[in-house]
C-alpha cells in the first residue's frame, strides 16, 4: 500500500482485494513420523501456493464505449514457480498497473504496466521496484490504445477465421510458429471467446455479425478469467498485444498478424 500512496497521495485508495488458490496442507518437521489422524492442531501446517491482490483507485477513471475503466494496481506471489527447499537469496513477485473494466471486471494490462518478475531482497527493496513500475506506466497512452480499438471491426468471417487459426496455432510445426506472434490463450480460452461472441451480454456480435476490436479484446480478457493466478497476467498482456496486432492486420495484410486472418 505504501508504494501506491507514495505515487497517488491525493487519491482515495480502495481496500485491497485478495484471492488465494491451491491450498497445501502439511506438518511441522517434528511431526513427520506421526500418522495424519494423530496430528495435533499445532503440528499441522497450511499455506496457499498462489496469491493475487488488486487495489483500485476509483478517482482515476475513463469511459470507453460506455464502459467505465478504473485504475487498478495488483500483483501475484506464486510458490509453485520457486524451489522452496533451496537457500533463498531473494523473493519473486509479479506486479502490474492497468485498468479494470467495471462492466465485467476484466483486467486491462499493457506491456509497460507489467513486470513479470520482480526480485526483492526486502520489503523496502520490493517497494522501491514497485514504485519504479508505477512511475514508468503511461496511463494515457494505454487508454488511447484501447480507445483506438473501437476504430476497427471484425466481420463474422474475420472472427471465424481468427478462431480457426487460433485453434491451429498450437499445433503448428515449431519452425512455422517461430515466425508468428505469440498467442498465449489455449483451446479452452478460444472456445469461451467463440461462445461469448454469441452469448455475452456486453460484448457479443451485432445484428450483422460484426464485432469491434474493443469488444473482441474484452472477449479475450473475459476468457482469461479461467486462467490460474500465476498465468493470467501474462495472458492478459498478450491479449492486448494480440488485439492491437489484429487491428493493424485488418488494414495491413503484410503484418505478421495477418496469418490469423488469411
Predicted feature descriptions by range:
Residues 1-10, 15-17:
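Charge-rich, low-complexity N-terminal segments
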Residues 12-262:
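Intrinsically disordered, low-complexity regions enriched in serine/threonine
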